[in-house]
Design a protein with these regions (language model features):
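Short aromatic-cysteine micro-motif
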Residues: 11, 58-88, 116-171
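Domain-scale activation on soluble regions of proteins
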Residues: 1-30
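Active-site-adjacent "lid"/gating segments
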Residues: 49, 54-59, 95, 102-129
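Extracytoplasmic and endomembrane cell-envelope/extracellular-matrix remodeling and assembly machinery
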Residues: 21-39, 43-45, 50-52
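Short, flexible loop/turn elements at secondary-structure junctions
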Residues: 41-43, 48-50, 68-70, 75, ...
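Surface-exposed recognition segments
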Residues: 18-22, 58-62, 78, 86-109, ...
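Conserved active-site beta-strand-loop modules that form the wall/rim of enzyme catalytic pockets
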Residues: 44, 156, 173, 178-181
Length: 254
């Protein structure tokens, strides 16, 4: 369902007339002022429980040691992207990973996917055609490279997937599901993971390389997949998904 929507948008965005296949859609929910959710860390358990449905890459449950950290209550906004762009964000090497900077230069990237700046406003192409976005609406269609650079610019970082899942089972519960949220974690098997036999085992196991994990679900994600343990994954230059970022930062160990 979600991939059908994003594939249609990707195809229509390449069309010279940029058609819409449905009427205008409502903007993403306004988020309000940002605050920090502080978590003590410690030894936590992540992964899907044994009962109930989950994909094989969500198993097995295992323990992870987390240092104290904080997550933002909201996703990064178009207003914050404005500040990044105004500061020369797409042309400042110090904010970019080496591969990310090479990607920006090779593809002349100066805005999120499907987005363009028209004077003082942002326009983004989506299922309903092009519409104006801005303010505290969450930024969408970001690559991992962009998400990482924007987080650095804002004096923060991306969360690990373990940090994200631990928070989603606590104070972050009910605060996600608008955009897939990039994490800093490489897509890899959990300790003790064994791919199933035959074609079923190939679905996830063979993709566990050169990809980054996203968490949280988006406005187009089926409700059954919006769960704390669900692991989405894409290469770092992917921008056709409804992907954004949530800031994280370290806290002092007391």
């Amino acid at each position: 369902q979600e991939l059908i929507v994003t594939d249609i948008v990707a195809a229509f965005a390449e069309h010279p007339l940029r058609p819409a296949y449905r009427g205008p859609i409502a903007p993403a929910p306004r988020q309000g002022a940002a605050a920090w959710l502080e978590l003590a860390g410690g030894e936590v358990t992540i992964g899907a429980p044994a009962d109930g449905f989950a994909f094989d890459n969500e198993h097995p449950r295992h323990r992870v040691l987390l240092a104290p950290y904080a997550l933002s209550t909201r996703l990064v906004t178009w207003a914050e992207l404005d500040a990044f762009v105004d500061a020369g964000g797409y042309a400042t090497p110090s904010w970019w990973l080496s591969d990310g900077l090479d990607w920006v230069r090779a593809h002349h990237v100066d805005a999120p996917g499907y987005a363009r700046r028209d004077g003082g406003r942002w326009l983004v192409f989506g299922p309903g055609g092009e519409r104006e976005v801005g303010g505290d609406e969450p930024v969408l269609f970001l690559s991992y490279y962009e998400a990482d650079a924007i987080a650095r610019f804002l004096g923060a970082r991306l969360p690990t997937e373990a940090e994200w899942e631990h928070a989603a089972r606590g104070p972050l519960a009910g605060r996600h599901g608008v955009a897939w949220e990039w994490t800093s974690s490489a897509y890899a098997p959990y300790p003790g993971y064994r791919a199933g036999a035959g074609a079923l085992g190939e679905y996830n196991g063979k993709f566990m390389v050169n990809q980054l994990v996203l968490r949280g679900g988006s406005i187009a994600t089926p409700p059954g997949h919006v769960r704390p343990s669900y692991r989405n994954f894409w290469p770092p230059d992917t921008r056709f998904q409804l992907s954004g970022l949530r800031l994280a930062r370290d806290l002092e160990v007391r």
